[in-house]
Curated annotation (Swiss-Prot):
InterPro entries per the UniProt record, alphabetical: NusB-like_sf, NusB_fam, NusB_RsmB_TIM44
Gene Ontology MF term list: RNA binding
Annotated protein name in UniProt: Transcription antitermination protein NusB
Keyword RNA-binding found: yes
Transcription regulation in keyword set: yes
UniProt keyword list: RNA-binding, Transcription, Transcription antitermination, Transcription regulation
Protein function: Involved in transcription antitermination. Required for transcription of ribosomal RNA (rRNA) genes. Binds specifically to the boxA antiterminator sequence of the ribosomal RNA (rrn) operons.
Gene label: nusB
One Pfam match: NusB
Family label: Belongs to the NusB family.
Protein's GO biological process: DNA-templated transcription termination; transcription antitermination
Protein origin, superkingdom: Bacteria
Lineage start: Bacteria, Bacillati, Bacillota, Clostridia, Peptostreptococcales
């Protein structure tokens, strides 16, 4: 399994957790690791999910702050899952370049979101990166 597919699976799990309002990683781990997932990708999935769950309030607060005029409960569930994934990577996984996280989030948005989702996701992530000065640290 490639990192791209691992990222997609992680987004789907975050989506499922949100829909079920159950952010207990033990409940999803059993079916997460069925099949042929390489150890490196298992580690990635586990780390992203842990960071997203442990920092859910902080991540959601950032999403609300940068999605001007949009309350969290008005953001489409899939868009929210994509943003939570991307912010988990950008903020807590410094080994992943923020540009990769943004590009991959946009690709997921093109596949799973509405026609507006890629621009919405790009706008929020781009504003965050700019405001936080991450572009200066390249």
């Amino acid at each position: 399994m490639s990192r791209k597919l691992a990222r997609e699976l992680t987004m789907k799990v975050l989506f499922e957790m949100h829909i079920n309002n159950d952010f207990n990683i033990q409940r999803v781990e059993h079916h997460l690791f069925e099949g042929s997932i390489e150890e490196q990708q298992k580690e990635y999935i586990h780390k992203v999910l842990n960071e997203a769950i442990l920092n859910l309030e902080a991540i959601d607060s950032i999403i609300e702050e940068y999605s001007t005029s949009w309350k969290l409960n008005r953001i489409a569930n899939v868009d929210l899952a994509i943003l939570r994934l991307a912010f988990s990577e950008i903020i807590y996984m410094k080994d992943i370049p923020y540009r990769v996280s943004i590009n991959e989030a946009i690709e997921l948005a093109k596949i799973y979101g509405s026609d507006e989702t890629p621009n919405f996701v790009n706008g929020i992530l781009g504003k965050y990166v700019e405001q936080e000065g991450l572009m200066l640290n390249e």
